Amino acid sequence: MTTVAEAELEAANEIAPTKPPKLNTAAFKAVPETRALRDQVRAAVEAFCKTIDKSKPLTRDISREMSEQILASLGLGGQYLGFTMVMLTNEFWREQVAAIPFNRRLMLLPHCLKNAEGCPAEYDEFGLDCKKCGACEVGDFRTKAEQLGYKVLVSEGTPIVLKIIVSGHIDAIVGVACLNVLEKAFDKVLLAGIPCIATPLLSSNCKNTSVDNDWVFESIDLHTPPAGQKTKTYMHLMRAANAMFDEPELSRLVPRARAASPETDPLRKHEAIAYDFLARGGKRSRPFITLAAFDALKGAPATLSDSGWELSDSVKRAALAIETFHKASLVHDDIEDDDSYRYGEETLHRVHGVGTAINVGDYLIGLGYRLVSRDRKELGSDVAADILDKLADSHMKLSEGQGAELLWRDAPNKALTTLDALKIYALKTSPAFEAALYSGVRLAGSVEKYEKMIADFSRNVGVAFQILNDIKDWTGDHDNKLVAGQDVCAARPTLLLALALEGSSPAQREELLHLISTARTEGTDAEELVGRVRALYFSAKVFEKADKLVDKFRAKAESLADEVEPTEFREFLYYLVDTVLEKGELPRQAITQFVQLGM
């Protein structure tokens, strides 16, 4: 693990200063006690918003700064900051929400408005199935919204809402929620660039709560001619990236060579397995990066409209190639780690056998190269050659990183330094970001002046992203049917392990090395193993240390983006940092372990 390029070694050592810690918002979530005071804050926000430029996306930091100004002008305390930020966001988007047809809007209602003692409704996969019995406001709001053509969900789950947004079924959200829920959803909705209006609940009790009903009905009824000023959003490009994997579009872009063969033909079956896995699951972030980088260097027309711009099939196929390589690596990784689930379903090798799964991964690699090489006439031979070279380089780095991880896992000596872990991350995770970003830039024109920046930026983003994944591993993952601590059970060389080894006492270090060395031994009690390692990690404060490293790598990536021109490309790089490096809560010392689903 000492033969990695000097650039990666320097990147691990040269880290920008840590940003100031994020504001603790617990003391800023009070709702003004009287309706008169709520109306006063809203009126001040409306007046303030008449002066701001709504073509630029609103961020949490900008919203907080503006809200603090408004509260200061009213002589009110900071306890109303969260409420004021919601009012500001509402006013920012109000005109654009009003211009969107009712049948393209989603009404999102909280279950805590229901009458807890007598509610006859039951829960399904989408939330509370309201019976409209008249015992609470939920039915009234739902009836009104559905009469106008809204899609309605009684749920507070952000993931399902984001899936609906990306799928292209809605263009705006009108919601009701407490300030705690709105805070959690704030960054996701703003980053998605989806017009939204939310009416805050008057308390966060999560039971028999109340709301300003007339404000809710007002937001449901909003309807005006198309807005004169639109805010930039990457939603159109997210949807374009997502749509490439839906049928019949996937088979149109990448025709199935064996489609005419009988269904019983093994060649057709093998092709179907590969296409099914290519289309399955994932956020499609890598092809999105390629499309968005290409668009940014073409003036970013797709960020202002879902019409008037078009991506050629050759550009789409190049973006598809990035995801094809990613999916191939997942198939092979799952075999090497003997993982049970991927995207909430059994892994390919568990369903079809190791041999078939290996071959499907190889098939996807070949398909990825062919997607670019077959379009060299449309792209230009030099463009195709440059992209193929970058894909090959990324493929080799990924294999080096995975190889180093496997050799460490199977070696008797489990010593690991933070530098060792960071070098593996720079090889395993960063190349995918680099290939996606490079391809988009090269499709748009010359890449020469961006090449070093792309490599450095991708390295910092990729390493930070992998550290966040390490942290997330300790909170579990319901979507992929994983319990917390899977990296320990698989004896992976993570940064968290390296930090623990370096920050523990000799006795703790010896115990940790023993635990990792026996993690994959038959008969090991996984729950006991994870519990003991968790305790050692907390003793060494590894989660806090890892979180600070994420901040440092993020700051370095942002400093690289600061120097980039044109503005559209620089703004996309900032957006990429915000979305890829979105943080969750740090693991808690005492949590209830997730139950392994489907076992």
What are these regions (language model features)?
Residues 2-106:
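Electropositive, gly/pro-rich neighborhoods at or near active sites that engage anionic ligands
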Residues 148, 191-194:
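Short, structured coil segments at secondary-structure junctions
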Residues 235-277:
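Charge-patterned, long linear interaction tracts outside catalytic cores
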